[in-house]
Amino acid sequence: MLNLIYTMYLPNFFKVFLLTAFQIIFLSNLIHAQSNCENDVIVQTVNGKLRGVIENNIYVWKGVRYAQPPIGNFRFKSPQSLNNWEGVIDADKFGAVCPQTRNIDSTVKTSEDCLFLNIWSPGISNCNRPVMVYIHGGAFYSGAGSLPIYNGSNLANKGDVVIVTINYRFGAFGFLYVD
C-alpha cells in the first residue's frame, strides 16, 4: 500500500506543491501595493492584480487561484499554470473546498474548482520575510487550507512571517493522472 502511495500520489502532489510554491514566491515578492480604502489592499502579482483585506492589522488574501481550474479537459491532469488576467480580482473570501469523502461541514462549499491558496502577511513592504507554507493533513482524502484552525493571522503577527495555506485535490481527482 505504501508503495502505491509513493508511486501514484506523491509525484502529482509534488507537482501541485511546486506550482503552489512558484506562485507564492511571486506573491511574496510583491511588485506594487496600494491601499484604496481602510480595509483593502491591492497587490500586483506576475499574473495580475489582487485585492485583499486588512484583518486585525494583518494583510490577507483569500481564495487566490494558483492553477487553472481542474475541470473539463484538466480533470485528471497535472495542475496547469495560471493564465494572466486583466483588472483586479477580489481575494477577500476563501475559495471552494475540494470534494472529499469525509465532509468537513455541510455549510462549506465544495467544488472541483478548488485550487486556491490563502495568504496572511504582517506587511506589504519590499522587505524580505520568511514564507511558511502549511499543507494541511487529512491523509490525502480530507481537509482544507481555509479551516479556522489554519488561520495564519496570529503566526504572521507574532513571527513577522508570511503564512500560506493551500487547498489540494484528493483521491482520484488529485492523484489519478491520465495522459
Name each model-derived stretch:
Residues 9, 33-179:
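Non-catalytic accessory segments of hydrolases
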Residues 12-13, 25, 44:
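Residues at the start of alpha-helices and the adjacent loop-to-helix junctions
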Residues 25-33:
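Hydrophobic membrane-targeting alpha-helices
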